[in-house]
Amino acid sequence: MRQANWLVSCEQWPHFQGGFGQYFYLRPNHAMFVLPPEITDEMTAGVNCAYTQVYAGLDIAGLKAGQTVVVQGAGGLGVYACAVAREMGAGRVIVIDGIDERLELARQFGADTFVDLREFTTPEARVKRVKELTDNWGGDVVLELVGHPGVVDERLRMTAPEGTYLEIGNINVGWKAEFDPSWIIFGNRRIIGLAHYEAEHLRGALDLMLRTLTKYPWRKVVSHKYPLEEINRAFAEQDKGHVTRAAIMPN
């Protein structure tokens, strides 16, 4: 089952295993779920690569009721993380970002406290602010969803003793991060990297979405739609940070 759900290059036979394709090959034992009519295609566009990843990450991290979750980055992954953390019982959800529309959407998805990058402009200031908001404790679970190695040390320093640093954003091979490993050891902290998840995580994520359809604005996560011939513009505008999640509409 693990092999069935693992990434395989589209260069390998039978090739139809990548995005933006007309066909997709399902290997033996590949898990599939039938969507209820209440969940639209638009709402599920980010379920596989975003929503279920943060669901699985918070589940594996062992988030407990009343704990504090810190979310770095309020893009698609970040706003999903806010709702999942809230539904898993987080007592406080702190979001770090600097774009108004992203901060507002995060609020609609359950975030209650914000660290604005335009106000807290240095790593030291942001770490200090998170500590102030948590009685000098830090986040019990801290999610890195930005995808830049320069934030790794900063996120670790705002992770509480016996807390979990959840790394989902840094997917670029070859990039390096520098941090003090003693911070992990003396605080009994742990680092979890996550890209893949089990079928039960997808089931749980879909169930959560279904039961909270009127609580969170799931339809707003896909903020921009592009025809297939404008796919390059979609990527360019996504990189600017003002597109929460882009959808490519086939002809």
Protein language model features and the residues they cover:
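Helix-to-beta-strand junctions that scaffold the AdoMet/dcAdoMet cofactor pocket
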Residues: 159-161
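Adenosine-nucleotide cofactor-binding segment
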Residues: 71-74, 86-154, 174
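Glycine-rich phosphate/adenylate-binding loop and adjacent beta-alpha elements
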Residues: 1-32
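Short helix-loop-beta connector
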Residues: 38-40, 62-68, 136-137
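A glycine-rich, Thr/Ser-enriched phosphate-binding loop motif common to dinucleotide/cofactor-binding enzymes
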Residues: 14-19, 37-59, 71-80
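Acidic carboxylate diad motif detector
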Residues: 168-169
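C-terminal hydrophobic helical "lid"/dimerization subdomain
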Residues: 141, 153-157, 199-251
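Rossmann-fold dehydrogenase core element
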Residues: 163-164, 178-220
